[in-house]
Each structure stands twice: as C-alpha cells, then as structure tokens.
Amino acid sequence: LCLSSAVHDLLLENPDAKISVNTPFVEVFRFYRLSGICKESGQVTITWDHYRQAVEQAKESPQHVTEFFHDVLANLTGLPCSKRTLRPVIHSAANERVNPFAENKYWVVFAGGKSDIPLKLWYGPYFQQVADYLHSCGRLVVQTGRSKDRHYHLRQSIKIFDDNYKPSNIRRLFQIIKYAEGVICPITSGMHIAAAFDKPCVVIGGGREDPWWEAYNSDYGAFGGHYSGVPHKYLNTVGTDMPCCRLSGCWNRQFQNIETEGCDNFAKTVEFPGQIAHCMLAIDPSSVIAAIDSYIR
C-alpha cells in the first residue's frame, strides 16, 4: 500500500518510462498505467535491508514510510521521483463508487490482528467500550479483516459489532473504508487505506513502531513538518517513561518466552494470545473516544 504513493509519483514524473510492479498485492495497483512484466535485466528490488536501514536513519532525521519508498525507488531506478503524493493512491472503478451501507454513518474497526505480531493487539474489552460509545452517537460499527492465514477477530469471544464483514477481496475492503466516516485500528492496512481516501483514523499505535515512520500527521517531524491530508490521531507511548520505548519503538514481533527474545513488558490476559503489551494497555478507551470526538463533534 505505501509503495503505491511512490509508484504513482514515479509514473507522473516519467510518463515515457515502462514501469511494472511485481508484488503479491496486485489489486492495489489496478487501473495504474503500468507495463507488462519487465525483463530481468531491468528489474530493481526493494529489500528488507533497505527498509531496516531507513528505519534506523529515520530515528535521527524523521521520515515517513511513504517518503522512504520515494527515496529508494529514485535511487534504485535512477529516475526522478519527487515527493508529491505522500499517502497511498488507490483508483476506484465505477462500480466501487457506491456506499456499501446505503446512507448509514459507520466506523470501520479492526478488532483483532495477526498471530505473528501479537504486540500490535489491543484489549478486547476496550473495543467493547468504544463500540458502545459509537452506538450511543448513532453510528454503526463494522468490523472487517481477514479470517485466515494467522488472522483472527475478537468477534469470536465478544459480540460488539453490527457487521462482521469479511470482504472477499481487498478491493471490497477499499470500498468499505472509502465510504466510512472513519477507521479505528492498530498499526495495520486499515490506517493506510484510510489515508488513501483521506479519511479520519484513530490508530492505536502503542510503543512498537516509531510514530514518525507510521503516522499520517505532522506531529512527529515527518513530511517536512506538514502533512497535507486529514491528520490521523496516532495514539502511542514512544517518548514516555516506559523503558522499552523511551526513545523509539522496540520493533519486537513476539512476547519474550523461554524460547525466543522479545517484549518482556506485558500483562496476562484470558484472550488470545494470552498476553497484551503494556504499551497497548496504556491506551485506554477514553483516549480513543476523545480522538473520535475530535472528528465527529
């Protein structure tokens, strides 16, 4: 998703260049002016080494992940790629320009996550309180997300949502978010799709990732200090007294146990996966509700 902003600007600035994208997420690039598969001699590859190096550099000179993709594409291709569009770009077909929930106001909630990075998960009962509040404001609450491949949803344990919508493909998810009033999620695709459609988004970020790298707003020094879209409310604990994220995100993937290193600052919970990071637990429902109010009041 974040790569799309750089590909969009690369195409704008180099209209005569033959550009293709080799990615598992081809639906993101539907309706782009792309060529077919490039010959191997003309391919460039963005690697995890590029990503990790940029994350470290951003701690000294804050930049957003979309800025990184512009820089790395310009460096690898040798083509100019000015930072014109620093949020994902998704083009919609005519049949996708319809509100899937008629005229109802609704918020999309990603309550759950992936088992391979459980540190991103927020506390289920907190989602309950936020959903109750949205209902009291006359809003529908729509949960969405995948239901396989290490993904799971809190709907399995608590029934808090008007609709537990599992889109058949990511294009349908784009449509749902495009017509939503806003999105509530941890750090996941939902926040990037919300940015693409310039939608309000409350991100429960915790302390795992650096806010300047993830947040679509001007609060952390990225975007040259000026983000042009609807600013997201990025709730996080980086820079607080928590020792694990006092200066920057920890970037751990798993909780520490006898077999693996990882986050050791967590609480036990009866919900899957059995632990919740204290940096996520520190973000309480009142903070999320206040962020929602800043958009709807």
Which positions does each model-derived feature cover?
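Short, aromatic/basic amphipathic alpha-helical patches
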Residues: 25-38, 151-159, 214-220
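Short acidic-hydrophobic, aromatic-tinged amphipathic segments that line or gate anion-handling sites
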Residues: 37-41, 164-165, 233-239
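Active-site and donor-binding regions of nucleotide-sugar-utilizing enzymes
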Residues: 1-68, 172-175, 182, 191, ...
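Nucleotide-sugar donor-binding patch of glycosyltransferase catalytic domains
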Residues: 24, 195-296
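Donor-binding and catalytic core of enzymes assembling or modifying cell-surface/extracellular glycoconjugates
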Residues: 1-5, 121-212
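Mid-sequence helix-capping/hinge segment at a functional interface
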Residues: 53-124
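Short, well-ordered beta-to-alpha junction loops that form the rim of enzyme active sites
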Residues: 24, 111-113, 144-147
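Glycine-rich, N-terminal phosphate-binding loop of Rossmann-like dinucleotide-binding domains
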Residues: 49, 111-112, 187
